A protein has these predicted regions:
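Generic hydrophobic, helix-prone segments enriched in Leu/Val/Ile
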Residues: 40-41, 70-73, 82, 98, ...
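Charged, amphipathic alpha-helical segments
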Residues: 28-45
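Extracellular repetitive beta-rich solenoid segments
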Residues: 1-20, 44-52, 58-67, 74-79, ...
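Cysteine-centric segments in proteins
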Residues: 28-31, 83-88, 120-121, 125-129
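Intrinsically disordered, low-complexity linker/tail regions enriched in Pro/Ser/Thr
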Residues: 23-26
Length: 130
């Protein structure tokens, strides 16, 4: 990735971003869920990713409810394991329940909302390679 930089006297030049990730990846995304049925929020391939850390912002705009959580996910090739923690919300309880499984060669992060109103999940995922 390149960006413009200045030398302080007004001269511009291109430079290369200083971060190179060799054993991990940084991904972000958005998923909207308008049901209380269990739904896939995100997936990653079991043959390339061993574990991931998610930072997730959850918005139920219909009811003006907001929550932010962290989740750690790992797998052994057959089963997936998830730990959700650090929930901060303006509501009396969590807006969703998180689970994880392995299906079709992917780890799936699953959400089950407490309401069927449209809920937006914005996330950042840091994943570690196998």
């Amino acid at each position: 990735n390149q960006f413009l930089k200045t030398d302080g006297s007004g001269a511009l030049s291109f430079a290369t971003a200083g971060a190179t990730l060799n054993n991990s990846d940084l991904v972000d995304g958005t998923t909207t869920v308008a049901t209380s049925a269990t739904t896939v929020m995100n997936t990653f391939a079991i043959d390339t990713v061993r574990s991931a850390k998610y930072f997730i912002s959850i918005t139920d705009a219909t009811n003006s409810r907001f929550e932010v959580v962290e989740a750690n996910v790992t797998h052994d090739g057959s089963d997936a394991y998830i730990s959700v923690f650090g929930s901060t919300t303006d509501h009396t309880g969590p807006l969703t329940t998180f689970t994880a499984d392995v299906s079709g060669g992917n780890v799936r992060i699953l959400v089950t909302n407490t309401s069927s109103d449209s809920t937006v999940f914005k996330f950042q995922r840091i994943s570690m390679d196998v």
